[in-house]
Swiss-Prot record:
Cited function: Component of the ubiquinol-cytochrome c reductase complex (complex III or cytochrome b-c1 complex) that is part of the mitochondrial respiratory chain. The b-c1 complex mediates electron transfer from ubiquinol to cytochrome c. Contributes to the generation of a proton gradient across the mitochondrial membrane that is then used for ATP synthesis.
Biological process terms in GO annotation: mitochondrial electron transport, ubiquinol to cytochrome c
Main location: mitochondrion
Protein known as: Cytochrome b
Domain of life: Eukaryota
Amino acid sequence: MTNTRKSHPLMKILNHSFIDLPTPPNISSWWNFGSLLGACLAVQIITGLFLAMHYTADTMTAFSSVTHICRDVNYGWIIRYMHANGASMFFTCLFIHVGRGLYYGSFTLTETWNIGIILLFSVMATAFMGYVLPWGQMSFWGATVITNLLSAIPYIGTNLVEWIWGGFSVDKATLTRFFAFHFILPFIISALVMVHLLFLHETGSNNPLGLKSNSDKIPFHPYYTIKDLLGLLLLLMLLMMLVLFHPDLLGDPDNYSPANPLNTPPHIKPEWYFLFAYAILRSIPNKLGGVLALATSILILAIIPMLQTTKQQSMVFRPLSQTLFWILVSDLFILTWIGGQPVEYPFIIIGQSASILYFSLILILMPTANLIENNMLKW
């Protein structure tokens, strides 16, 4: 008799994706973050759904509805803080996932990589719109400043901004549409995740050595299901520690004041996971130049497969490239720190230097290091 999981049309898909999937035997814990991202997405959708049951997308009541969730709804406070801090966990996993792809050369699987970039943009858009919903001071001014950047686009900029706002300023129409998009986007992201996995399973997963492992594979279950479960437990432990002990650690105190269009906060800044891009934006004195640099800082990931000049896929045996990779990671930490600082000396010059280094590393230094390593190995 045929096994149901191998014959049933639906079970067959799940079986080929998560149970009998041939997997390289040597993938390390850096490969855990894909499943952790799936778990983060599930947590965000579930908590978000419960929050949406009590939230009202209206400028007069949005702030008080969030307060009502925290004070009056049964366990509303934990749902709200799991959602807010879950976003931080999501981005932490996302950045590590992208970093792992860069380090081990997973960007050579171009379809998977490109869908991943679209996913990154979608998650960033969702998180930005979600930050606007509590309608606190930083929500309002963050929405005003970031959407206003589109006015730098020649000819159509101003019309585009007013079209997004639904008026001549950030108001009720903006909040309503941001809530609608924030609600629908996670489901679009879920569909994109399936496409991401579809392309990944077409080629098979990469591994730390960057070698073909077709001749030596093991089933995904039970080996990697157990391994992913351990990662999930650690992630949930970290999330719950954050939620229960330091729920406001990563938030902005200004967001506990209701939105006031007549009072600008002294330092307008986005959530921590956007600070690196915000620092790059601010490091260029010209508005259009800043917007282009901001977009390029993420879009640059799309041209990395074209800049690949090495004969080895992984960085494991390439010490020069490894050094540059960790300099890039350090540079991103510096940019994140600078993004949260006021625009004054010495932060301006540090931000500009870090931005130049960021683009130089990816566009010039790393491809050059690849060529040097090829030459040293006589390839």
